[in-house]
Amino acid sequence: MNYTYKQIWLINFPVMMSILMEQLINITDAIFLGHVGEVELGASALSGIYYLAVYMLGFGFSIGLQVMIARRNGEQHYKETGRTFFQGVYFLSGMVVILCLLLHLASPLILRRLITSDEIFRAVIHYLDWRSFGLLFSFPFLAFRSFLVGITTTKALSVAAIMAICINIPFNYLLIFKLNLGISGAAMASSLAEFGAFIVLLLYMWVRVDKVKYGLKVVYDGKVLIKLLRISVWSMLHSFVSVAPWFLFFVAIEHLGRTELAISNITRSVSTVFFVIVNSFASTTGSLVSNLIGAGQGKELFPVCHKVLRLGYAVGGPLIVMALWGNQWVIGFYTNNDNLSTSIWYIRL
């Protein structure tokens, strides 16, 4: 099982598009809200990263799920991949219901103590009230993505990502500007986009995946679930901790003023692109390594990792140069506010 650069890229690109989907939803919200006002742009930073921190709990669990599925796939125990997949679906479905309730009930109490501006606080709560519904679709989506990446069949992820963006952009424009729903409209559009992406993968799994080969029948296996949790709890913790400091950073910036918060949001949105590249290659590496270990081909691990590293630099390097060279264009794309545009050196930093 000697993976070539082309094979690695063909597996990774849909994964990258899939991870980029979640970030592009936040970026699109920021771009549209940047043309509404500083309060909305700043509030989208706080609410977006707050939502993302919760989302990363599911994302972290999906990493462990993907590793287990990939291992079974490499061992050619294909029916076990389906059994493992359903344990992941059960856990993610239960967790997302609890998290949605907590978001609605606890968020106002937590954020009221952290956010000083009443305007920004109200805008953040309005956003989260609608955005939290997106978790009901994004968590099952994560389970589907883990399965497809684990069996190295990832083309459908690109279609799902395109569907999400095709829904998010027009609905953002319609709900924010035409129906004057402001930041609530952005949250509605984002949740609809995640629903669309989920439906794409659901239909693909139902129609195209060999359900007999992969044992895709509803079954509960407590032992598999416990083993899955032992693997996933650490990736859940790591994923949450990797994002939570960003929220604390934005809370600190909010105390400086709405303009500073808006500028920081633009900076984070640009840097998110590089986060996506790193995350996608990490996800692909985890799947390929698990498949190789399952197939008993440990000698291929380091050559594959070296190839992934080279591809990562080849993709990320030019984008860094473009971000540094075209920062003035980036600012103008987000906002037409002269006050924000004069602070362009933050982007250079």
Residue ranges, per PLM feature:
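Interhelical loop/hinge segments that connect adjacent transmembrane helices in multipass membrane
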Residues: 1-12, 190, 199-242
